[in-house]
Amino acid sequence: MLLPIYLYGHPVLRKVAEDITPDYPKLKELIANMTESMYHSDGIGLAAPQIGLPIRVLVIDADPLKEDYPECAGFKRVMINAHIEERGEDLCTEYEGCLSLPAIHEKVERPTSIRIRYVDEDFQPHEEVLHGFAARVVQHEYDHIDGKLFIDHISPIRKQLIKGKLQNIIKGKVRTSYRVVTAPTGKRR
């Protein structure tokens, strides 16, 4: 089932998400719906807060980026209760976009490597060290479960320059190819 994407300005995007337990209701169905919604929206990642749930669930498929970023080849994950344990010292700046911030793309500086621990959809524990764009994608989605957005990492001047676009998103004056929920009333369209 396709789920609507919650847009910038909705309070759920600013909540720190909670860990879940293996008995979370209909978890497999939720993961399948999140994955379907991510693909339908042409995304490479989706976090549960982006569909209105303040829980620590991420779905990622960065494989479409493999031609430009070989480290993304086959990089498909479900990450539950993820926690970044360590961030590398080397930084890299790349453009990022977000389904919750349609039509906004900004340069974001992030560590080029991370160490993350999480459980998968079967609640099997994992710990991985990720590098390059795969690390960037995970950090971007991880921000969502910590109540952050990629625009929180840009300069005040850049934020000022996109202020009008952000206001339009809040007002629902934005076109998308996917269903959305806008702020502050949670109106669906």
Curated annotation (Swiss-Prot):
EC supergroup of this enzyme: hydrolase
MF term (GO), any: peptide deformylase activity
GO BP annotations listed: co-translational protein modification; translation
Catalytic activity: N-terminal N-formyl-L-methionyl-[peptide] + H2O = N-terminal L-methionyl-[peptide] + formate
Enzyme Commission number(s) of this protein: 3.5.1.88
Cofactors required: Fe(2+)
NCBIfam families: pept_deformyl, PRK00150.1-3
Family membership noted in the UniProt record: Belongs to the polypeptide deformylase family.
Protein name: Peptide deformylase
Record organism: Porphyromonas gingivalis (strain ATCC 33277 / DSM 20709 / CIP 103683 / JCM 12257 / NCTC 11834 / 2561)
Organism ancestry: Bacteria, Pseudomonadati, Bacteroidota, Bacteroidia, Bacteroidales
